[in-house]
């Protein structure tokens, strides 16, 4: 954990969102495979502290969007990976990673359904559609660690909830197979 680096991550993403708004764009859009809306940095940072992410080595974000959760996770883990199909969001992840000099984050411009999640200590999702549309099957087949689900919506039906907690009114749930 590094509060100074976290502050820099927040500043970098704040600038990105302000630039979008100046151009008349909202910081959310369709990616062609789903829908992107950014995570709230302070909530994710607090959740990562609560689950003691620093005691784990690997993290993967399925549908990592602009990479914010991955760069925050990289402050805790040895290796943080993000998979994002939208090229503009993928490029923004790489840009902020370089600017912030966070070397233990890795980003792939790909469909996360084609990326194995086996072997990761934590899998992060902020789902944009019901789990029964393919995500839950992937998790049931490949999840070897824990799932950190962000939000009150689209929870898996066949995984076991280990922990649930609120951060600023938003729900985080830890699941296992």
How would you name each of these model-derived features?
Residues 1-54:
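S-adenosyl-L-methionine
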Residues 56-63:
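Conserved class I S-adenosyl-L-methionine
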Residues 68-77:
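Conserved SAM-binding loop of SAM-dependent methyltransferases across substrates and taxa
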Residues 86:
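Conserved SAM/SAH-binding beta-strand->alpha-helix loop
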Residues 93-94:
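Conserved SAM-binding loop
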Residues 131-177:
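C-terminal substrate-binding/active-site "lid" region of AdoMet-derived donor-dependent transferases
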């Amino acid at each position: 954990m590094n509060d100074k680096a976290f502050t820099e991550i927040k500043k970098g993403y704040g600038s990105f969102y302000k630039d979008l708004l100046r151009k008349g764009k909202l910081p959310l859009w369709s990616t062609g495979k789903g829908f992107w809306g950014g995570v709230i940095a302070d909530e994710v940072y607090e959740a990562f502290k609560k689950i003691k992410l620093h005691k784990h080595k690997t993290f993967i974000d399925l549908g990592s969007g602009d990479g914010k959760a991955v760069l925050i996770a990289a402050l805790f883990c040895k290796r943080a990976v993000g998979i994002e199909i939208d090229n503009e969001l993928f490029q923004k992840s790489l840009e902020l990673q370089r600017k912030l000099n966070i070397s233990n984050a890795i980003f792939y411009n790909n469909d996360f359904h084609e990326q194995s999640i086996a072997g990761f200590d934590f899998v992060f999702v902020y789902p944009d559609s019901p789990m029964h549309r393919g995500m839950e099957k992937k998790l049931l087949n490949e999840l070897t660690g824990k799932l950190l689900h962000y939000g009150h919506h689209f929870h898996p039906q066949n995984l076991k909830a280990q922990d649930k907690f609120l951060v600023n009114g938003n729900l985080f749930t830890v699941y296992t197979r």
